[in-house]
């Protein structure tokens, strides 16, 4: 079915491409204007925000194709450096919700004496992580991190775009601290305050999450409150590329 849909999309794209680029853009803009004027301004804004979200999905799909199955954001935002720079060589590192293993791979390559384990619940992502060109100090395992984690102690726990996918975040973080017993927890989450349109999206009732599987996209205040309630102290934090990057320690360490 997917192959058929892609074939149909390819055919339609070729037909659409026959039209001059300027005409295509004017037609699309005209449709957006009409959609924004369907109903009152609040409804029109909600409609346009829905289109913007769909366009973001299309852009991300093309970005993955452009990047050869790896999203260019890894290269352009250099967020991997945030994790690499905070992992000492020789450390035991647990990457929770490692996805395709991109961050874990960067850390393992840069810190050859470290031992890095990535855990992931999604079988497809895990398989891709395991079959990539991985250094010998990196391994992957299947795990539902909300139910069981590899026991510690781990020197560093990495949570890159994980917390926003969880409803019981504070309980999860407490479990991580109790089971993994880390000295340091490195966290990356999307920031709600990245754009004024996020607040307007919420105000008009449009979706303001960057992923339909997100339960939250933190404000700075929410992130500070949740980490503190879980028993973490923020040692250093930066906001960049619409995200919060935080270097945390368990309280008492």
Regions found by a protein language model. Give the residues of each.
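Conserved acidic residues
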Residues: 91, 155, 183
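Conserved N-terminal segment of class I S-adenosyl-L-methionine
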Residues: 2-152, 171-173, 202-203, 213-216, ...
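A short glycine-rich, Lys/Arg-flanked "PGG" loop and its adjoining helix->strand segment in the class I
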Residues: 171-184
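Short active-site alpha-helical segment characteristic of glycosyltransferases
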Residues: 223
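A conserved beta-strand element that flanks and buttresses the S-adenosyl-L-methionine
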Residues: 158
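Hydrophobic adenine-recognition pocket in adenosine-nucleotide-binding enzymes
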Residues: 162
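Conserved class I S-adenosyl-L-methionine
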Residues: 186-208
């Amino acid at each position: 079915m997917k192959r058929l849909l892609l074939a149909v999309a390819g055919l339609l794209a070729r037909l659409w491409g026959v039209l001059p680029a300027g005409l295509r853009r004017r037609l699309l803009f005209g449709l957006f204007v009409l959609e924004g004027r369907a109903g009152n301004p609040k409804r029109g804004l909600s409609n346009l925000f829905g289109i913007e979200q769909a366009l973001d999905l299309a852009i991300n799909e093309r970005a993955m194709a452009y990047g050869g199955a790896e999203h260019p954001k890894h290269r352009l935002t250099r967020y991997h450096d945030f994790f690499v720079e905070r992992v000492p060589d020789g450390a035991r590192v647990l990457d929770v919700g490692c996805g395709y293993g991109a961050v874990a791979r960067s850390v393992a390559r840069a810190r050859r004496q470290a031992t890095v384990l990535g855990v992931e619940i999604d079988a497809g992502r895990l398989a891709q992580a395991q079959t990539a060109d991985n250094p010998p100090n990196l391994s992957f395992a299947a795990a539902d991190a909300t139910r069981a984690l590899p026991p510690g102690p781990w020197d560093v726990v990495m949570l890159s775009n994980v917390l926003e996918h969880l409803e019981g975040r504070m309980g999860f973080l407490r479990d991580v601290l109790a089971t993994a017993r880390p000295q340091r927890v490195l966290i990356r989450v999307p920031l709600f305050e990245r754009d004024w349109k996020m607040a307007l999206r919420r105000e008009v009732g449009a979706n303001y999450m960057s992923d339909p599987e997100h339960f939250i996209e933190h404000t700075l205040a929410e992130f500070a409150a949740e980490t503190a309630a879980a028993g973490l102290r923020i040692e250093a934090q930066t906001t960049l590329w619409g995200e919060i990057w935080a270097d945390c320690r368990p309280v008492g360490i």
